[in-house]
Amino acid sequence: MRRTALVLTASAPEGRASELAQFPSAVPAPHPPPVSLPSPTAAPGFAMGNVPSAVKHCLSYQQLLREHLWIGDSVAGALDPAQETSQLSGLPEFVKIVEVGPRDGLQNEKVIVPTDIKIEFINRLSQTGLSVIEVTSFVSSRWVPQVAAGATEISVFGAASESFSKKNINCSIEESMGKFEEVVKSARHMNIPARGYVSCALGCPYEGSITPQKVTEVSKRLYGMGCYEISLGDTIGVGTPGSMKRMLESVMKEIPPGALAVHCHDTYGQALANILTALQMGINVVDSAVSGLGGCPYAKGASGNVATEDLVYMLNGLGLNTGVNLYKVMEAGDFICKAVNKTTNSKVAQASFNA
């Protein structure tokens, strides 16, 4: 049986963390309002959101949806992987998706999301086949009051930019490394895996361009202290396939691709292209957020993460296995968007729900 890891991120290295409450993952949440979605087995002709009517009634379009989108209990696309991957080289057979919506997504909301809504949201995500879900962060309530919980894995947040490090975690890069070492060491003693993040890997809102060498140095430090995986974040979404390739080439001289992940925001619409570039270079772990939730309180103008729905749709189309049920991800996204009264940023969801 697939197990879902609930991840706690550590973003307050100077001891300003609020008191933690154990996350009640097994506590039944109140029944939410029913989600209105077309059935995965719906007959041809069901409404498809903002897709033009003429296209909706095209038989070939409906066939595409039956094979490629409404995959029911399937964990991979219905298309033949041999047919799809023959067009692109170097792609992994399996891609692990790290869902960051509950943590990175909800931290940017202006209102505090009620605990029962968070629990129901996470419970829904845990039923999608996602193997890793970041549920929250522990940080000072003075800085980011929206998050509080506990988990079975931790992450630490470094940065390749001095200015961003001071804005985001209130200390220099060097100071943060010392704090992170203590956290990772303590986690290892408790047999809790630690993941390392490098923010601003492709650009900084305060310093502009970041050199690949700087990203490599921070990544090497995190990997050396015991982080089993390093997630390289395009925090403000300014990267392109070219800059992604150059950055990864540098980092991969020090860290094997099997220990790397990418975390792309979609500010300039480049997230999926950047992810595809990373996959072709041997990366097989990708962070995403359902409905494209997110942003960063300390990176003004940055849009949300790449939408999990859009990522899974692309990976299905490439014939790659993710273990994720796209239909159930869309249900979870619809639930949280209604709960926080916002419109989904997922193109797949926008094209799939009733207008």
Where are these regions (language model features)?
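Catalytic cores and adjacent flexible loops of soluble metabolic enzymes
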Residues: 1-355
